[in-house]
Curated annotation (Swiss-Prot):
CDD domains: NTP-PPase_HisIE_like. One of its GO terms (biological process) is L-histidine biosynthetic process. Keywords: Amino-acid biosynthesis, ATP-binding, Cytoplasm, Histidine biosynthesis, Hydrolase, Nucleotide-binding. It catalyses: 1-(5-phospho-beta-D-ribosyl)-ATP + H2O = 1-(5-phospho-beta-D-ribosyl)-5'-AMP + diphosphate + H(+). This is Phosphoribosyl-ATP pyrophosphatase. Pathway: Amino-acid biosynthesis; L-histidine biosynthesis; L-histidine from 5-phospho-alpha-D-ribose 1-diphosphate: step 2/9. Signal peptide: none annotated. GO terms for cellular component: cytoplasm. Belongs to the PRA-PH family. It is found in: Cytoplasm. Its EC number is 3.6.1.31.
Length: 107
C-alpha cells in the first residue's frame, strides 16, 4: 500500500514540476492553497455522506479522493510524503489515552 501512495505522490510532484495543460492536478496547483483546501473539505463531506449511507464502495472511492487532494496539499506546501510516513510509523503501536486528547468543543 505504501508503494501506491509513493507512486501517487511522485506523479503529483511531477505534475507540479512539469505542468500538463489538461491536468486536473495542475489546475489545483494553479488555483492555489485555498482551492486545494476547499476540495479537501468537499471530499471529506462526501466520505461522511457515504458512511451515513452505508455505501462501502462509495466510501472507498471518496477516501481515495481525500488522499489524492491531501497529497496535492502536501506537494503545494513542499512537505515530503516520507515525513508523513515517518510520523505514521512513529505513532504506530502507541497507546493513546482518551484523557490525553482535548475535547472537540474546546478546539
Amino acid at each position: 500500500m505504501e508503494n501506491a501512495f509513493k507512486l501517487l505522490y511522485k506523479t503529483i510532484e511531477e505534475r507540479k514540476g512539469s505542468p500538463l495543460p489538461e491536468s486536473y492536478t495542475n489546475y489545483l496547483f494553479s488555483k492555489g492553497e485555498d482551492k486545494i483546501l476547499k476540495k479537501i473539505g468537499e471530499e471529506c463531506a462526501e466520505v461522511i455522506i457515504a458512511c451515513k449511507n452505508n455505501d462501502k464502495e462509495e466510501v472507498v472511492k471518496e477516501m481515495v479522493d481525500v488522499f489524492y487532494h491531501c497529497f496535492v496539499l502536501l506537494a503545494e506546501k513542499n512537505i515530503a510524503l516520507e515525513d508523513v510516513m515517518r510520523e505514521v510509523k512513529e505513532r504506530n503501536g502507541k497507546l493513546s489515552r482518551v484523557g490525553d486528547r482535548r475535547e472537540i468543543d474546546t478546539l
